[in-house]
Amino acid sequence: MKPAQKCNTLTKANRKKLVTRSTLGVALVALAVTALVVDPVVLIAKYQLRVTPGTEMYRMLTSEIEGAYVSAYLFNISNAEAFLSGADSRLRVHEVGPFTYQEKRYNTHFEVDEKAQVLRYRPFINVTFMPEMSVAEPADVNVTVGNTALLAIATAMSSHPFWSQLALNLLTRRYKSRAVVTLPVHDLLWGHHEPLLAFGHKLMPGWINFEQLGLLDRLYDNTREYQLELSLEDQTKFQVRRVNGHAGLTAWSYNDPNKRSRCNTFVDAYEGFSYPAGLTPERPIRLYRNVFCRMLEVDFSGTKTLDYGPELYVYKLSNRTFTKNPDTECLCSAIGCKDGLSDLSPCFYSLPVMMSNAHFYGAPAEVYARIDGIAPDEQKHGGVFAIDQKLGSALQTSMTFQLNVPVADVTYNKEARSFANITVPIAYFKVTQPEVPDHVKTLFWLVYVLGPYAVYAVAAGLAAAGLGLLATAACLLSTPMPLTKQAIARVQVHCELPLIKHAHKQTLLSDRARQYDRGETGVRE
């Protein structure tokens, strides 16, 4: 026997309110929890960092970018005549600088390949002199430095037969090349006439394609275009995939499949302006710039927070960068490896030029044992990089690199013999990232400072509204129906009448049962 139907005292309007308020209340509470877990402000920021038209990142990469400051310091030789004559056995130097320039960079042939998930472009860099950040105008200051061309060529010829060395000696006398030159800083950086180079350019234009030698002029050689291909996949965003179509450094034997290794491939290599979002301390990172002719190894060092909000991961240039180890062994194929130094010759027209930290920081003391005036200091000459760990933006950079000529046994050459077996420092460059613009600071402040409070406030409001709606829905279930004629009639129709019908049905069934019982009794009698 079925039980009597329960009496529903809710009106049709109240039932609709109950469903609406319950559904909306649950949705608002769920939305509040989602806002706290997902952090929508960071999601919006990541959206703007996509490389698609209309985003901030796309605008930046397709516009002229005010890049890093590059400060040049020259190693002025203070005892040139005494050292060349043999009166002094030690080379004395002191740094002159800074002469600061700012990079202006724009990317040509810009292409976003969404199907392959890569970004392609050709970086083009010009520099502008910054007098307010310099000690003087470069053209107004003379310095005395080692003649890079003569010392490098003499070193290159030191392993050649006697007749080749004799030819160089004859050319040195004919063109009156000196192992030490005194030049304006501007000429040293941007080009000065060196007779040996001019002769080499005429004799072998395919090898030496320039007549004047300038340190920055060679480093910012825009005549040698190269194309970068970067990943756009979330986990490897902005990682270098290819340079000029190659997935490794062709200068360091990448084209030989038997010599490929982490050393000459772009594994974990980035150009340095941005990285994948959500970095972890365990994630390996290397830096690649064409001018370095290699990857720079960096190590996680710690964290810090900027006053406008970002939480930064701090990395330092690793000692592994300038020591012989599995990550650098491919770099030892040309003129060999020396601790504290890195060979640049494959990218410097095969001339023996080596890179180091400024003042040979991190190199063993024997590298500069015959040089006075070298004072390595981690604070001044080390490399530090700070990256926003949530969004992957590089916000602080400071590093140095020094150009040196590792002079071999050049006693066969009268002009260069005083420098035999000395690694001669020519100049070093300090690269620093400019302070981020105010509008970028404001964006980070919104993401890291105001954003979280706004999310908490909105989440609290959503949760309160949702719980309030659920509470009013619960009240609808327990609120008595108002005693109006319509309500009473409804109760009578929907509640009392079914009960009366049910009671009447029960009475009829009981009567029939009693009649049945009497009938059975009569039969037995």
What are these regions (language model features)?
Residues 1-3, 522-525:
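A positional/structural detector of protein chain ends, strongest at the extreme C-terminus
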Residues 2-306, 310-311, 318-393, 398-517:
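Extracellular or lumenal secretory-pathway regions
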